[in-house]
Amino acid sequence: MNQVEVKRRQIQSFSYVLACINIWVFGKSIGDNGLGYLAAAVLVFALFWVLTGKNLPDRMGRMLRGRNARGQYRNVSRMRKNMMLFQIAEGLLGTVLCMSLGWILLEKVFLVPYGSMILWILSPALFLRCIQSVFLGYFQSEGSEMPSAVSSVLRQVFFLGLGLVFLGIFRNYGEKVSLLLKRTDFTSMYGAMGIAVGMLLSEVLVLLFVFVIYRGSMAGRREAESGMKGTDSFSSQLRTLLIPMGGDI
């Protein structure tokens, strides 16, 4: 593990500390019931994320780094574009499956009857993260670990700010619903839904961040991609990138 990767992991460890702070802040706001609704939905979301693209940046970075070293810039460009198309399709499929099947885990396994609405809000974040993973994988193939590290910190910062904003909006509405239906748990549930909205919008902002960095490096990349042509087919590229991923899942 080189020094750049060590630095990236250290920054990501700091993002985990921020995540714990976020959990504490939101837990104080929505209580045990609301935190339970949110935790169950996030757990199901994480399961689908592991199955779609969690390991892609590291795998893609290692696979493309060797091709960059051999000057196969056209091959790298084709593989990146093909992987983007594949991840878009996989992200859409994962989102649909998470929204349509995730409620079974929530309501039948975890026995959380109101968690489905939270999961439906979170599910589109799968699609956003799948796209992010391709950009981050390409940055790592260029030897740049900082976009992955910085994005992990920004995700928690955005999540805290947006989560608090939408927590207040949704919780106020939940209080009205609770008074109308005489069910106190609706306040916690709607508060958790607001936090989920903040989480989803955080992924949008992180995607915009990595895309801006990607666009900023396009000029130099186009010059490099005029080099050696690649000969790998689309199917061989997918096998190269995806088959080794199973070992980490």
Q: What function would you assign to each model-found segment?
A:
Residues 1-21, 119, 123, 146-150, ...:
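Hydrophobic faces of transmembrane alpha-helices in multi-pass small-molecule transporters and flippases
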Residues 2-58, 243-249:
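Signature of the first transmembrane helix
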Residues 12, 16, 43-46, 82, ...:
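Residue-level recognition of pore/gate-forming positions within transmembrane alpha-helices
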Residues 39-85, 136:
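Small-residue-rich hydrophobic transmembrane alpha-helices
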Residues 93-116, 178-182:
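Short membrane-interface helical motifs at transmembrane helix boundaries
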Residues 100, 111-135, 161-162:
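Alpha-helical transmembrane segments of multi-pass membrane proteins
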Residues 129-152:
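Membrane-interface junctions at transmembrane-helix termini in multi-pass inner-membrane proteins
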Residues 151-165, 169-220:
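Hydrophobic alpha-helical transmembrane segments
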